[in-house]
Amino acid sequence: MTTGAELQKYDPYRTFTREQWAKLRDDTPMTLRAEEIERMHSMLDRLDIKEVEEIYLPLSRLLSFYVSAARRLFESERRFLRIRDRKMPYIIGVAGSVAVGKSTTARVLQALLARWSPKPKVDLITTDGFLHSNAYLERAGLMDKKGFPESYNLGALLTFLSDIKAGRRDVRAPVYSHLTYDIVPNETIEIDQPDILIVEGLNVLQTGRLPADGKAVPFISDFFDFSVYIDADESTLQEWYAARFLKLRDTAFSDPRSYFHRYAGLSDEAAREKALSIWNKINRVNLRENVLPTRPRATLILKKGSDHVVERVSLRRL
């Protein structure tokens, strides 16, 4: 019979309590002000100086080692091959469920990494911009699958990442509006040779079926040098989603331009019932079928408790 100690020996991750992880900050300086941190967290997410000090500064320090090692390897390979390739951006993926706080993590990392010395250029995109338009999804009968892998323009996203990794200039990505719940026509953002690119999205760690003929099939995560999965229990995620829905009912949904404006007048009870219906019909299914199964593919897992605070950190062994 295999013992717990033996199983731990074969665990691909080293797991740290919050207290253990916080000590790994060492002497990494705090480069963010309290008012900056306050602006970074998403609706109802929790972020304060203590969270940055104990979770994100150690992660920033770790990433500095990874990025430096990647640059040294790139230079060594360039000398070995006797080529003069452009410097390739270091790409970090941030994955996790709806309402888990991916955007908060991505923004904090962008701010911290941009203040390394020397000042690297750090850009951030979300994969929301690569969703198919609502018109396309409606024609394809996929509106209830929005956020599922099949709702994305995967070809466009892979082309974007390939161009970024190749060091091309002025690479453009579509823009998504959370107000209208749709792609913004004729609007793009420009990514111009960043030193580091952070890519945030639900399914960025997902793979697909490999073809029987053995032909190479690229996945989004093939372009990542490091990846972070933000984790929380399913029951916790459900409560966060419902709470966010009620908050949006009182704020963004009140805008007549909002796709969800029809929910602005719902009572608390009716709004919660609608939120749970959407969660159970769409987000929970996507979590179980597509998002959660990608967790073991992450380089680092941040496990949050019900108070939005990271309780445990797991780092994949080299």
From Swiss-Prot:
One BP annotation, GO: coenzyme A biosynthetic process
GO cellular component, one term: cytoplasm
Enzyme class name: transferase
Pathway linked to the protein: Cofactor biosynthesis; coenzyme A biosynthesis; CoA from (R)-pantothenate: step 1/5
Cross-referenced Pfam families: PRK
Coiled-coil regions listed in the entry: none
Protein localization: Cytoplasm
Keyword Cytoplasm listed: yes
Record keywords: ATP-binding, Coenzyme A biosynthesis, Cytoplasm, Kinase, Nucleotide-binding, Transferase
Gene Ontology MF: a single term: pantothenate kinase activity
Binding site for ATP: G96, S97, V98, A99, V100, G101, K102, S103
E.C. number: 2.7.1.33
Transmembrane portions of the chain: none
Record field: catalytic activity: (R)-pantothenate + ATP = (R)-4'-phosphopantothenate + ADP + H(+)
Keyword tRNA processing: no
Family statement: Belongs to the prokaryotic pantothenate kinase family.
NCBIfam families: panK_bact
Name of this protein: Pantothenate kinase
